[in-house]
Curated annotation (Swiss-Prot):
Keywords: Hydrolase. It comes from the Bacteria. Residues 1-103 are annotated as: RU A. Residues 253-366 are annotated as: RU C. Its EC number is 3.5.2.-. It comes from Azorhizobium caulinodans (strain ATCC 43989 / DSM 5975 / JCM 20966 / LMG 6465 / NBRC 14845 / NCIMB 13405 / ORS 571). This is Cyclic amide hydrolase. Belongs to the cyclic amide hydrolase (CyAH) family. InterPro entries: AtzD/Barbiturase, AtzD/Barbiturase_RUA, AtzD/Barbiturase_RUB, AtzD/Barbiturase_RUC. It is an enzyme of class 3 (hydrolase). The active site is at K160, S230 (nucleophile).
Amino acid sequence: MKVGVHKLAMSAPGDVSELAALIETGAVNPREIVALVGKTEGNGGANDFTRGLATLSYQLLLARHLGLSPEEVGQRIAFVWSGGTEGVLSPHATLFTRAPDDGPMPAEPRLALGIGITRDIAPEEVGTTAMVEAVAGAVHTALAEAGITEPADVHYVQVKGPLLTPATIADADRRGARLVTRDPNGSKPYARGAMALGVALGLGEVAAERITPDMIACDMEVFSAVASTSAGGELTKCEVLLFGNAPGATSAFRIGHGVLKDAIDVAGVKEALRSAGLSFHGTPSEEQAHEIVAVFAKAEAPVNGRLRGRRTTMLSDADIHYERHARAAVGAVIASVTGDPAIFVSGGTEHQCAPGAAPIAAIVRA
């Protein structure tokens, strides 16, 4: 397996010009595209329609090149968007290609990617053990597809799935189905948490008996160390992208991960880069930073609003949601190390690392 990685700048949620140019020059074979992970400039909430616009724009472009309908493109390629480019974060997409490769095997394991898609998640299943189990099954599928046999070789599992919307709440009401909440934005923690627990269950990080209906989005001491989950109203299924290093892969990249102990943890950023194989002293030089291909992180407000003993207003600000504060802060910290603000930073860390902490993964050139 040979995985390709291309970072695409976007001037607007509907801008697909950089991918169009790569296809035109032959740098990217559209038939090898398997996934796209990106940041759009919406609010990141239940009413963020920039994610759907971005997906449709890429689907329309690829439909022309693949001879498929936009809907068929969506079934063939996983699109994962996180809304919210606060602070220095730059709207962009990271494109992944995958193809068989009979070339010489590298001495070390290289980047591998597996994808798993769940069935449709009913509104009443959002944020429940049914969602957990569905994601765990998709994780098993993705592991097999990536050719990874040891969960320890997995460094990043990105999951995007549905949250509740007014329309899906109304659908559940018509059927008399019970929901975890009636608040669309309030359903995000439940959805993100259930998906993260699905990753933990699928990778064997957590035993099944520890996951019960009443602990989802409540008992944060149960978590995955490599899950990164996002929820949006544009999806009905959960899409699982599993990244790790596999012996049979011939990619030109490696992936590693670390933990951000809080929103200003520079050491955690460097930990992820070194885990991926980037060698540097202090902070990466400009030349070394060019070897960093992509960084993916989660962001969270400090527990009780206090950051290293100092009071913050992240949790008490009535004008700006704490997730937006956190994304802006974490994005700036990471960019100060990598020198590139085109970073995937997503808010909300329910069951994703220990309370107050957040996962971070990095892809570098091998």
